[in-house]
From Swiss-Prot:
EC nos: 2.4.1.69, 2.4.1.344
Domain of life: Eukaryota
Disulphide bridges: none
Enzyme class: transferase
Protein name per its UniProtKB record: Galactoside alpha-(1,2)-fucosyltransferase 1
GO molecular function annotation: alpha-(1,2)-fucosyltransferase activity; galactoside 2-alpha-L-fucosyltransferase activity
Presence of keyword Glycosyltransferase: yes
Pathway(s) per entry: Protein modification; protein glycosylation
This protein's UniProt keywords: Glycoprotein, Glycosyltransferase, Golgi apparatus, Lipid metabolism, Membrane, Signal-anchor, Transferase, Transmembrane, Transmembrane helix
Reported function: Catalyzes the transfer of L-fucose, from a guanosine diphosphate-beta-L-fucose, to the terminal galactose residue of glycoconjugates through an alpha(1,2) linkage leading to H antigen synthesis that is an intermediate substrate in the synthesis of ABO blood group antigens. H antigen is essential for maturation of the glomerular layer of the main olfactory bulb, in cell migration and early cell-cell contacts during tumor associated angiogenesis. Preferentially fucosylates soluble lactose and to a lesser extent fucosylates glycolipids gangliosides GA1 and GM1a.
Recorded catalytic activity of this chain's protein: a beta-D-galactosyl-(1->4)-N-acetyl-beta-D-glucosaminyl derivative + GDP-beta-L-fucose = an alpha-L-Fuc-(1->2)-beta-D-Gal-(1->4)-beta-D-GlcNAc derivative + GDP + H(+); a ganglioside GA1 + GDP-beta-L-fucose = a ganglioside Fuc-GA1 + GDP + H(+); a beta-D-Gal-(1->3)-beta-D-GlcNAc-(1->3)-beta-D-Gal-(1->4)-beta-D-Glc-(1<->1')-Cer(d18:1(4E)) + GDP-beta-L-fucose = alpha-L-fucosyl-(1->2)- beta-D-galactosyl-(1->3)-N-acetyl-beta-D-glucosaminyl-(1->3)-beta-D-galactosyl-(1->4)-beta-D-glucosyl-(1<->1')-N-acylsphing-4-enine + GDP + H(+); a neolactoside nLc4Cer(d18:1(4E)) + GDP-beta-L-fucose = a neolactoside IV(2)-alpha-Fuc-nLc4Cer(d18:1(4E)) + GDP + H(+)
Pfam family, one: Glyco_transf_11
Amino acid sequence: MWPLSHRHLCLAFLLVCVLSAISFFLHIHQDSIRHGLGLSVLCPDRHLVTPPVAIFCLPGTPMSPNTSSPCPQHPASLSGTWTIYPDGRFGNQMGQYATLLALAQLNGRRAFILPAMHATLAPVFRITLPVLAPEVDSRTPWQELRLHDWMSEEYADLGDPFLKLSGFPCSWTFFHHLREQIRSEFTLHDHLREEAQSVLRRLRLGRSGDRPRTFVGVHVRRGDYLQVMPQRWKGVVANSAYLREAMDWFRARHEAPVFVVTSNGMEWCRENIDTSKGDVMFAGDGQEASPWKDFALLTQCNHTIMTIGTFGFWAAYLAGGDTVYLANFTLPDSEFLKIFKPEAAFLPEWVGINADLSPLWTLAEP
């Protein structure tokens, strides 16, 4: 029989070993939960059901701070998987992205974008939402919801854990409470911002040759809207009288502004915008295949004149400053007003100038 002191030493040693093993197991368990691993990692014979979400991001999605994961880490309180159909052009997809982000946060869900939206927005902005793998998208039991273009009470209490949104939402009523986060998501990549600022630095006032202090971005939407607005929506696009009045509004309030004009109809702009004061610069390239060049230029201006469309909305929203927009651009009985609410489309502090609807009256005459 061992002396009593030896027995105590052995018991103490065994107790330390047991406590160390328990502590090690608890540490591994807690660390695995913190990093998103479940009991299936510790016990391979257990097959737990996990949400069908992507585990990778496409190249170009920035990494979150203080993490080695290529995808941003979602807060542990979020669950489920939400995404949105990428539809339409550049401005449409910006609206879809911002609305998805805002509604997912409001409902405590994780937001993912589809590869097509990533391909449109990631080359321009430092977006952070992860990308849903196509194979995961195809096997997820989605519920689908088409959104109208303004925030509604029912959108704050959507119970579906796997929801695919659709539509063309671009209303500030969805996301304005997250304005700084939205502006951060739509931060330009450095080379695009620097290129746009380089263009602005080279501009000079025509009469004096001085460097302007105030830049007003002007976006003139034309293209397919020339047919779509009058023929489908009983509406008009901006004419030269609107642009002249909008520019005069800024001239009356800002010292020596310069107007930086971009459009998908630059030829019309050069022929119809009054340049006699020497403060109008035609800087846009009008290339619809590469809209980010004009967009970057507009966002680096101090203020905005927009006409109609989501491209102009987002340029104004990100630029900040004063915004003048084309108001009342459809007839009162237009079907467009069933899907578009002006009070939900334009921020309350923005200034509207009424459109000239007389061309529509001419069309209506027998």
